[in-house]
Amino acid sequence: MKRILTLTVAALALGTPALAYDGTNCKAPGNCWEPKPDYPAKVEGSKYDPQHDPAELSKQGESLAVMDARNEWRVWNMKKTGKFEYDVKKIDGYDETKAPPAE
């Protein structure tokens, strides 16, 4: 009996903090983020604005385009030979400035 009472008290003690938060500041269930008091409503132009360089941002887009071009060559080679070749430099006729030949 003493053991059950101890376990019940422990469960209540551990579960009580979960009941303390009433969610009054949540915009929706689970959306409870609030900015700090000095955080601006508009980030652009404030001290929190990261001011990313457009050239740096375009690098990822360029690398994705080059990756897609290599994948086109891999797919073309797979259809042609039936064998997948990861290293595009080993594909006959590979030219990084051109698209693979039309079928």
From Swiss-Prot:
GO-annotated molecular function: alcohol dehydrogenase (cytochrome c(L)) activity; alcohol dehydrogenase (NAD+) activity
Subcellular location: Periplasm
Pfam families linked: MDH
Main location: periplasm
Protein's UniProt name: Methanol dehydrogenase [cytochrome c] subunit 2
Keyword annotations: Disulfide bond, Methanol utilization, Oxidoreductase, Periplasm, Signal
EC number(s) reported in the record: 1.1.2.7
Keyword Methyltransferase on entry: no
Enzyme class at the top of the EC tree: oxidoreductase
Lineage: Bacteria, Pseudomonadati, Pseudomonadota, Alphaproteobacteria, Rhodobacterales
Gene Ontology biological-process annotations: methanol oxidation
Disulfide bonds: C26-C32
Quaternary state and interactors: Heterotetramer composed of 2 alpha and 2 beta subunits.
Family from the record: Belongs to the methanol dehydrogenase subunit 2 family.
Organism: Paracoccus denitrificans
